[in-house]
């Protein structure tokens, strides 16, 4: 076996990199210095691992070696075929071979190469580090092991390489505080102390705080708040993706995992944390191979390996419950989603950390709004994660505003720029008529420039005060961490000096500056550093597209006027609108069931009386846009097989990936009015589907995803019993009796029983028709105004249109046709013939029982 065959894979890779470096630098020979630079460039290599444990500026060392390489002679033509290893490099490899034999290794490892040739690198390393200290560190990384395989030196310090030490992070105060979850942490410690099967697995939905519970354990270990058995333990999070990454050959992943397990067994004080533990099932498996789960099983069963797993309930069912041998080795701990109050406690605990990070103040009202609004409007995620995200994003938005120029100052600067341009244009024209305007511009510019100077001075002053407050906060945070460190090391004198002398001194200064800042805020400051509930509502609005004001208290006052607002669009249906308004008011007052839709209504009545228009008006009023109306024509679902289109096709059928027409629409617009038009035309099985929505406020689509209907208003329209409603001779009691009879024939009792209101729309009378003509004409008026033409319609003309377009059986729809014929067609002709121009007025009046336009 020659020298090169005795090299480990990692040393071979280092040599290949050294050759590539020599080619890049156009050097004729590969030297030990090229080898050193190649090792410094390998972030996963043993040299970098050793240097990271020492107080060394690695980047400065790299630059020093780079400058040494630049001194080497360059040749014009060099290729991989004619490049040579110089004598010094071959000698260095032989030196490493000698050390290999002394150590009892079977292959030349990278650390052996470094240790055998430290004298070659001393001149370049000495200014940056103690070479004896480096030798000691390299020896400690070996931990007395011998290299018996080509791949063995890749797995030295496997745990360091593929894991993140959470206890070390807790020691350095790099973990967020963990609030609550005491019960779960105690149960986890209980399981870890067991003799066998001492492996807890945390189960819970994404975002409920599984990883935080493990971080809480790491913090308790550091603070010595754990039983004696766990006192000196290290919690190391295993990075599975890093373990799999770069495993080129079959069995390499398994080899790495085995080394990690061996290291954990030998150290005896490591608790391995595997997040997303379901990924170990099948990881690394190939034909005839063994997956990671099977490698872990024996060690887990014997209690040699302390492991904490974390996964979701869905993944646990999918992977663990199928593999009973793996399942019985873990003890499940279920983490439920915290309540709003528990989430609020967590947010209050994280408040200081977030304030320090973003350099702002977070009001308690913002924390309350975050917990409540996220629970109410962001239904596809879980507390506390979604509430923390809201606070974090709101704080980031505020920080951006703080670091940008204030809007008021920017506006003044833009105004100055605009006036300067106008001034230059007037100077170029040099007309006498421009003199007055020029004087006005000069006066405005003078005032604006003065205002700009004042605003800039105010901005600078506020910035200085804020910077000083931020600096003091950072210093106090640093002092608190220092005091914690002294306490842990038992130096209580130093800790007391910090807590009772240095921190109070800083707090006093900070209070004075805070008082100054508050005075600035009261006097109309340019900078706002406090996160409020309005900021949180704004972020929720960006996420969900729900208008901001809908989430705030001011909306309740607006809802009081809902009836009059709806009557502006829907005429002659006072009774129906009153019933709708009452249901909406109940919801806004918080008296309706929060697990059901905001309201569910069945609108009955003949065609053209305002059923669909009421739904549109409601969408406009509640959500500021008709676009928040999800309209589904139920006549498309007459056949039984078509019903599946509402929730999505079953697996294996065409359209499965597309989702359901109803469920997808509500998922995209969770805050909307859902209108199921002409519902009696649909197949009867549709109503079975709607029972779940009306009762529980959610519907499960074909993919098993739960779609929330709690923020929707469900309106079903129907022409059932329209005959009874059109009968003039029938009394109100007889009409109601006929309606009930018709409903019983068409709908099942369990469906009718779940509706909030069954609302009857009456046939329209002549007075209502005239009002509708007015509303329809307003739309024509708006279109004409866009062209700069003002049009009017007198009362007699309205009556004539109402008379021509009214039909008791067809409702208000024929009115549109009458308006087209009697007004719009005539107006269109005048525009196309250029008889009317912009800023003209046209009055439509009655002459000889006909509507004629009069141009003014």
Swiss-Prot record:
Ranges for region NBD2: 555-763
- Residues of the region (Repeat 1) are 7-72
Which cysteines pair up through disulfides? They are none
Q: Where is this region: C-terminal?
A: 764-856
Coiled-coil segments: 388-522
**Chain residue ranges for the region called Repeat 2:** 85-144
Q: Specify the superkingdom.
A: Bacteria
Keywords for the protein's UniProt record, in alphabetical order:
ATP-binding, Chaperone, Coiled coil, Cytoplasm, Nucleotide-binding, Repeat, Stress response
Q: Which GO terms describe its molecular function?
A: ATP binding; ATP hydrolysis activity
**Which residues does the record give as ATP 1 binding sites?**
204-211
Annotated ATP 2 binding sites = 605-612
What is an annotated GO biological process for this record, any one? cellular response to heat
Identify the Pfam families for this entry: AAA (PF00004), AAA_2 (PF07724), AAA_lid_9 (PF17871), Clp_N (PF02861), ClpB_D2-small (PF10431)
Q: Where is this region: Linker?
A: 338-545
The entry's localization annotation reads: Cytoplasm
One annotated Gene Ontology cellular component of this protein: cytoplasm
CDD domains (alphabetical): AAA (cd00009), RecA-like_ClpB_Hsp104-like (cd19499)
Q: Which residues form the Clp R domain?
A: 4-144
Q: Give the residue ranges for region: NBD1.
A: 157-337
Q: Which InterPro entries match?
A: AAA+_ATPase, ATPase_AAA_core, Clp_ATPase_C, Clp_N_dom_sf, Clp_R_dom, ClpA/B, ClpA/B_CS1, ClpA/B_CS2
**Family statement drawn from the similarity comment of this UniProt entry:** Belongs to the ClpA/ClpB family.
What is its quaternary makeup?
Homohexamer. The oligomerization is ATP-dependent.
Its function, per the record, reads: Part of a stress-induced multi-chaperone system, it is involved in the recovery of the cell from heat-induced damage, in cooperation with DnaK, DnaJ and GrpE. Acts before DnaK, in the processing of protein aggregates. Protein binding stimulates the ATPase activity; ATP hydrolysis unfolds the denatured protein aggregates, which probably helps expose new hydrophobic binding sites on the surface of ClpB-bound aggregates, contributing to the solubilization and refolding of denatured protein aggregates by DnaK.
Q: How does the entry describe the domains?
A: The Clp repeat (R) domain probably functions as a substrate-discriminating domain, recruiting aggregated proteins to the ClpB hexamer and/or stabilizing bound proteins. The NBD2 domain is responsible for oligomerization, whereas the NBD1 domain stabilizes the hexamer probably in an ATP-dependent manner. The movement of the coiled-coil domain is essential for ClpB ability to rescue proteins from an aggregated state, probably by pulling apart large aggregated proteins, which are bound between the coiled-coils motifs of adjacent ClpB subunits in the functional hexamer.
- In Swiss-Prot or TrEMBL terms, this protein is called Chaperone protein ClpB
Taxonomic lineage is: Bacteria, Pseudomonadati, Campylobacterota, Epsilonproteobacteria, Campylobacterales
